[in-house]
Amino acid sequence: MHNNTLPAAKSGEEPIPTTTATSTKPSSKLPLRPKKLLADSPSPPRILVIGAGSRGTAYAGAIATHTAATIVAVAEPVAFKRREFVRAYMDDSSGDGDGDDGSGDGQRGFAGWREWVAWERGRRAGGKAASVDAAFVCVLDEQHREVVQGLAPLGLAVMCEKPLATTLADCVAIYEAMLRGGGAAPQVFSIGHVLRYSPHNMLLRRLVGGIFRTVTGNWRRESTTAPSLLTKSCHDIDFLLWMLSEPAKEGGKAHKPAFLSSTGKLNFYRKARKPAAAGAATNCLSCPIERDCMFSAKKIYGERHLRNGNAKWPVKIVNPEIEDCLSTMGLDAAENMLLKDLSEDWTSDTPSEEVRRRPWFGRCVWEADNDVCDDQCVTITWEDDAASGSLAKTAQFHMVAFTEKICERRGRIYGTKGEIEYDSATIKLHDFATGHTETFYPEQPGGGHGGGDDGLATQFVQAVGAVKDGRMGVEEAQKRFIGCTLEEVVQSHAMVFAAEDARKQRAVVDWPSWWQKNVEERLPPKA
């Protein structure tokens, strides 16, 4: 039996959670935190959460559990979700008592982010100081640009859920807004790339960067839905760049990719694959083979979740009011609400704009207007770089829709001195020189993304606190706690769009020139 502990991080390196490598799985019990982060701060950060859905509540739970920061406001259009959020995550002292936003929550609950911005501007116009220090943006992906642009002039630190935006133009617009500050000084910025912050991946990065030079690696990301590289795997691409491009030590030079390529297509969810027995049915509720179909929306949302008392994700995605309906009116009423929503469908007379605008959760998977890949490969290549002292390497990423391992990640990394194989629970390191294989069992703290949700939220709050207390400047706090710059956030998203260009054009993309043309040259000149 081998029981080896990793050495402590050297000066300038990221701290790594205490993790033991052993041939037997360690106890799942975790040590209790002695006190909340920033408990000694004279003025812990005050937080605004925009969007009280799954992501907003995940981050709020981490903030409330692990930090001394205070959530003082929430902007959420669904009244039930807003009330529940206030009750769960905001104490009675939240808010400052000047007026009421009309929701019955004082200054704590707002029907939308614009309402909060208007209220905040009114306060400041009256000579009052800012009411919050930072905002978590957890709204729909396509709304990220307008929210971040609306917040930038207020000088708040921002944590935006991934993806940053749904188009390259919107990503560049967010980049410009936060870079230039909308007239305010630049602030700490983070993105919901939670894979960077789990104990598992922090250990994996240390093993990759500290034990051997990487030659090539294969990564797989698997999902049960028809995914896209942007919405489902932008943080996987970020994970690869974090693992293989960004320097492990402060002051080190990043090893930038040289070029990339991609192949992929929609293989399964096409009309040609539709079972003949389904006939002309376009909606699950009117389909003659609904009971035998593994993709039945009625079974997935209703029987598998709602009937078991779960009105949260994914059921509430169909209708955000279902949670309130279930708790106040009971299961029968909630099921009727769900079935009504699932029965909605479009016809040849439905305007194309309405078809694109609505999600149509009950639509037959083979009759939908889905055009995103359910199987895609991306190859990223680095060349020798004398400036950073890095050798050439290659990363191959495979995103697939069908797998037993739902939303889990597996990978194999080949280096000059050994290789690493990992899944969500273990990391195996094989040493070529000794022939010995060690198995590491990283800490499993629970919560979303292997502890990544909690890790991201607490690191962001610590960065905001360090700047607020005057212990660090924005740039230092950004690197120390967030671990990446605003530019690096945008680069990982831009690489997704570059990969899509490569796939559609059946071409190899030169990364430096693509970045210069599609991002740098789109930024407005400095005033």
Question: Across the structure, where does each feature detected by a protein language model lie?
Answer:
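NAD(P)-dinucleotide binding in Rossmann-like oxidoreductases
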Residues: K271, A276-G455
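Short amphipathic alpha-helix with an adjacent loop that forms part of the alpha/beta core around
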Residues: W113-V132
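N-terminal Rossmann-like dinucleotide-binding module
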Residues: H2-D96, D100-G102, L240
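Short aromatic-enriched loop/helix-cap "lid" or pocket-rim segments at secondary-structure transitions
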Residues: F85-R87, V172, N201-L203, T214-E222, ...
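C-terminal helix-rich "cap/oligomerization" subdomain common to oxidoreductases
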Residues: H2-T19, S23-D40, F136, W360-G362, ...
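Beta-strand-loop-alpha-helix segment that lines the small-molecule cofactor/substrate pocket
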Residues: A134, L140, R145-R196
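Conserved acidic residues
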Residues: V72, Q107, D133
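Predominantly a Rossmann-like dinucleotide-binding segment in NAD(P)-dependent oxidoreductases
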Residues: A184-Q187, V194-V355, R506
